Amino acid sequence: KDEILPEVEALSVEDAALMNIGGFNPNKGGLASVIGNASTQVCGAAGETTQYVKDFPSLVMADGPAGLRLAKEYYKDEKGAHAIGQSAVPESFLDYMSKPMIFFMNLFTGGNKGPKEGNKIKYQYCTAIPIGTAIAQSFNTELAEMYGDIVGSEMEMFGVHLWLAPALNIHRSIRCGRNFEYFSEDP
């Protein structure tokens, strides 16, 4: 039988639910607060676990098929970290959205606000590495490990706890659509 830690056993049903849905904040765009670029601790990170459960620190999660995907420029204020030059909608989505859709999405998510006077602009540049498919097809495990070390160092530097990439999959299903992110033997 698996043993449940006393700290977990002591959680209320509400706190356990918060732990499972992540950093959802109904006062910060509702559902939009959990879709990409949703971290308040590391600007541009994909999301984080909740900060609302006492004695459980939040975990920051970043994605990116070619290294960490974080905002390059950002500022911090009392509400958290905010990207400069980006909206709450990930840039990769913008290419597929019409101008009216972008307008309403920015309206819904709070748009692209710049820093107030006196806020210091900060920078976080991440190393670009080849996508998972290219790394796997090199059959060079030492090189793959080196790329992992690079990303791991940057995760420590920027305060990211979990990297949501690359995945491991075979490319036999066309329904996936994100095959470029996977380690695989299939070209």
Q: Residue locations for each model-derived region?
A:
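Glycoside hydrolase catalytic-domain context in secreted enzymes
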Residues: K1-P187
